[in-house]
Amino acid sequence: MTLVIDASAVAAWLLPDAVGIDLAALASRHDIFTAPWLLWAEFRNILIVTERRGRLPLGMADQLIEAVDALGIVLDQTPSNAAVLALSRKHRLTVYDALYLELALRGGHDLATLDAKLADAAREEGLSVAR
């Protein structure tokens, strides 16, 4: 079973002061993690901002990137432009969040997110949301 995972879920699992989704538990129920290509940049941005704010020791970002890479998250490169825009309009989501929703819908996958608006949109579309 495949799980679409967003940057908020990954960050909450790995950052030392964050509380969130237990990806280890989700991994026992899902054999593949996937995300839009955007996750690559979003997660690194979260790390660098967290580091700048002093919440992450210098150098730890590199270790966390290695941990995420070890998850083997499959990055999707083929979103439907029309579907992403339609979902963004329908649910008043950013295009960034609509990318995650479109991928989950296209594959019929569950979605892991801590973003309340994205989770609500996924539920409205009939998807299961891990929080």
Positions of PLM-derived features:
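Acidic catalytic patch
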Residues: 37, 60-91, 102
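Short, well-structured N-terminal submotif of metal-dependent ribonuclease cores
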Residues: 1-38, 50-62, 125
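Contiguous, function-dense segments enriched for cysteine-driven chemistry
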Residues: 7, 15-19, 63, 71-76, ...
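Acidic, PIN/NYN-like endoribonuclease modules and their adjacent C-terminal/linker elements
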Residues: 1-2, 40, 93, 101-131
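Short amphipathic alpha-helical interaction patches enriched in hydrophobic/aromatic residues
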Residues: 47-51, 72, 108
